[in-house]
A protein has these predicted regions:
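Interfacial aromatic-anchored transmembrane helix boundaries in multi-pass membrane proteins
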Residues: 51-59, 83-114
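Hydrophobic alpha-helical transmembrane segments
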Residues: 9, 13-14, 36-41, 47-57, 64, 77-86, 118-132, ...
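Short helix-perturbing small/polar motifs within transmembrane alpha-helices
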Residues: 104-149
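Hydrophobic transmembrane alpha-helices
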Residues: 2-68
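Alpha-helix C-terminal capping segments
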Residues: 69-76
């Protein structure tokens, strides 16, 4: 769900950059030192999974994994998503630098929605609600990222 360069107005770009910067800063503050390797591994998975495109009609689709990142990392998903999108912009020209904030905000807010919905349904217990919570969390991440895009 990369937004192309030149499509959005300056106020939208600035708002997206502010939301992304706040999310990245708060995510860096919230991440625990023992989760750095997990965040790096999940960031690499997010980066690679989004490069595998499946043709569908005249377009294509790819895995997003922002819901998974949100459920596992919580707020730390924001900086992970930012780094992955930055690398995609630098290496493959997906998205761009001016829309990096908006792309990070839409993906990061979707990840946070998945985090909130998953833990609201599943709570702290490990029972049958986990399957429903996982589905709802992942579905909401894609839905909210799509709506925000």
């Amino acid at each position: 769900m990369h937004i192309a360069e030149g499509v959005l107005s300056a106020p939208v770009l600035i708002t997206g950059a502010v939301v992304a910067a706040a999310g990245v800063a708060y995510g860096l503050k919230k991440i625990q030192a023992n989760h750095f390797m997990l965040a790096g591994l999940l960031g690499a998975a997010f980066f690679v999974a989004s490069l595998i495109h499946v043709p569908i009609g005249f377009s294509s689709a790819h895995l997003i994994l922002n819901g998974f990142l949100g459920v596992v990392l919580g707020w730390a998903a924001f900086p992970v998503i930012f780094v992955a999108l930055l690398l995609q912009a630098v290496l493959f020209q997906f998205g761009g630098f001016t829309v990096l904030g908006v792309n990070t905000a839409t993906m990061g807010l979707g990840a946070l929605a998945a985090y909130g919905i998953f833990y609201a349904i599943a709570g702290k217990s490990a029972n049958k609600r986990l399957k429903l919570a996982g589905f709802c969390g992942g579905f909401s991440a894609v839905l909210i990222s799509g709506i925000l895009t």
